Amino acid sequence: MTLYRNLLLLASLGLSYAAPSKVQRAPDSSLHARAVCTPTAGGDSSTDDVPAITEALSSCGNGGTIVFPEGSTYYLNSVLDLGNCSNCDIQVEGLLKFASDTDYWSGRTAMISVSDVDGLKLRSLTGSGVIDGNGQDAWDLFASDSSYSRPTLLYITGGSNLEISGLRQKNPPNVFNSVKGGATNVVFSNLKMDANSKSDNPPKNTDGFDIGESTYVTITEVTVVNDDDCVALKPSSNYVTVDTISCTGSHGISVGSLGKSSDDSVKNIYVTGATMINSTKAAGIKTYPSGGDHGTSTVSNVTFTDFTVDNSDYAFQIQSCYGEDDDYCEENPGNAKLTDIVVSSFSGTTSDKYDPVVANIDCGSDGTCGISISGFDVKAPSGKSEVLCANTPSDLGVTCTSGASG
């Protein structure tokens, strides 16, 4: 009888496993449309619209959308802090115009501050959005007082998964975009950037991109007109890709400067599809020499490929005596460690400034010069193509002429 009861129990359990009850899942009622906010513009430059934008960020900054409509103008007379954004989408289809108040901006780091933000999209979907740094007064003041400290237009420090796209950025008092503080996964795409002075004073120090301590930064489909580095790869930049960029009037795409007062490194850089117009150089590396308070510079796994040179002074340049004169560097030679530097597929014509020289490769005698060059088809206006070299490897890939400096 006991055995019969046990068999009956097992049978009932087996039946239970064979025909489990179905669980019906109701639709998730917690999914909501993104909150959308449109800040109220004050209407003229006497009203600072930053408080209204900050209020919109408080309401919609956590996963919502903030819209600046096409045809609208917002006057920003103070720093715009986007710290309240978390996975928010800021769509600039109108004009954000900063005040030119040189007293207010003196010594400030940023006009737009993005500090430890995750998931920001700052973009224009229509391509009509403009961020105007209104930097003319700052350039004019700096021309007479080089100690005047000017802010960066967009300053990113820390954070991750940031997208800046589709916008026009114009006339920053200083640098256009800066990335540092360990930021990661930052994408700049489809940007038009220009700094044009209406006076005889040039838009000094208007780097397009200063990329410092960060990883996985991408710059793609960008046009820059400025008066300093188009892209500056600063200390501790790592895994940076620049793909399809046009730079006019710049100091080129530069690694550095490095080693001014500490040991600095830049590594894992890939630059391709660059058109360099009226630049002091198309691409290059700038390192301080040894001695004094200078540190050691390490540059590794850097590729410059598919460059078109149009009236730029040098196609490629390495400076191992940056920031010092020749006498200093005779006593304190360059000690930068350059490894796996690839320069390939350069074409075009330089300016006549250094004709017949098209490149100046001055590696430090106390460092390493791991550089290879291939597909280098750049000529001076005379039709000649002379490359000045110092302390370069025998298998560099181009015919060298002695006399490199810098």
Swiss-Prot record:
Signal peptide: 1-18
Name listed for the protein in its UniProt record: Probable endo-xylogalacturonan hydrolase A
Active site: D228 (proton donor), H251
GO cellular component: extracellular region
Sequence similarity: Belongs to the glycosyl hydrolase 28 family.
Function: Pectinolytic enzyme involved in the degradation of xylogalacturonan (xga), a galacturonan backbone heavily substituted with xylose, and which is one important component of the hairy regions of pectin. Activity requires a galacturonic acid backbone substituted with xylose.
PbH1 repeat start-end pairs: 183-213, 214-235, 266-289, 299-320, 333-375
